[in-house]
């Protein structure tokens, strides 16, 4: 990994770091923030309508269709187990629209209205990152797809921002999700589930958890994988063992054809505290 951190979840202390404060793309590990924001702003039994824009998200996807309805719970399992990009967009558009004060369903949105709702959700992600204590994190997309945006500063100058975080910030976000959020129990429940099946709109779906560490490592109970061409393979996860909880975040862990790099056995092996 080009960047890594091992964090004591109880104290927030960094036990090991490698380029842990260097900003990098983080791919679908982004979705831990999307998940916790949705949990904090919606009830899992609420229904989400699908917009035409959400349905156009690239693979990996659930293949939702405009006008369909899913529960927040169903989309959250789709989001966190299978890492579906359209589920992320649908959830973000629903919450973002509510934050904008909208009353109509997302299925009635124009493309510009959908983008405005997603932008508002990204603002909420960045506000939450500041609240958590992140020092160099910027969210643009709810699914972690690589993105850049142009900001106009108060003095009129232009600033280019990329979707990014640091290994340390990413670990701090997961710490918030499992330790501090009022919805931490639901977050843990969703991210530790191995399989979730549901039927909606006349179709049946099966979601399987792609976090292999839940099976590979004793005590592993949550986490999220990620990959984009820019970010490479990424991972953030937590483990409870011997009365301690540790969080690891890894960014830029290689690119194809190196998907089988054997770094897993070292993930939660803490070196001497620094």
Each language-model region and where it sits:
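Domain-terminus/edge residues, biased toward the C-terminal soluble/receptor-binding domains
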Residues: 155-270, 274
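Active-site-adjacent loops and short helices of periplasmic peptidoglycan-processing enzymes
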Residues: 1-168, 178-181
């Amino acid at each position: 990994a080009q960047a890594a951190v091992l964090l004591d979840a109880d104290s927030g202390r960094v036990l090991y770091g490698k380029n842990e404060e260097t900003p990098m793309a983080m791919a679908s590990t982004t979705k831990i923030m999307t998940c916790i924001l949705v949990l904090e702003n919606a009830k899992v039994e609420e229904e989400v309508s699908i917009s035409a824009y959400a349905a156009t998200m690239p693979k990996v996807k659930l293949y939702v269709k405009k006008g369909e309805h899913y529960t927040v719970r169903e989309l959250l399992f789709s989001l966190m187990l299978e890492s579906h990009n359209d589920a992320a967009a649908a959830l973000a558009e629903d919450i973002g629209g509510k934050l904008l004060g909208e009353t109509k369903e997302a299925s009635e949105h124009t493309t510009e209205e959908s983008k405005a709702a997603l932008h508002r959700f990204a603002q909420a992600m960045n506000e939450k990152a500041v609240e958590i204590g992140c020092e160099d994190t910027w969210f643009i997309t709810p699914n972690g797809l690589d993105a850049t945006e142009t900001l106009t500063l108060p003095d009129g100058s232009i600033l280019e921002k990329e979707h990014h975080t640091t290994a340390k910030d990413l670990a701090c976000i997961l710490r918030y999700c499992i330790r501090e959020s009022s919805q931490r129990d639901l977050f843990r429940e969703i991210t530790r589930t191995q399989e979730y099946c549901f039927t909606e709109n006349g179709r049946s779906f099966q979601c399987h958890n792609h976090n292999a560490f839940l099976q590979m490592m004793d005590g592993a109970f949550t986490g999220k994988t990620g990959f984009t061409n820019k970010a490479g393979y990424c991972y953030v996860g937590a483990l409870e063992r011997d009365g301690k909880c540790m969080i690891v975040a890894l960014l830029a862990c290689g690119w194809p054809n190196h998907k089988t790099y054997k770094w897993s056995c070292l993930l939660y092996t803490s070196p001497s505290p620094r």
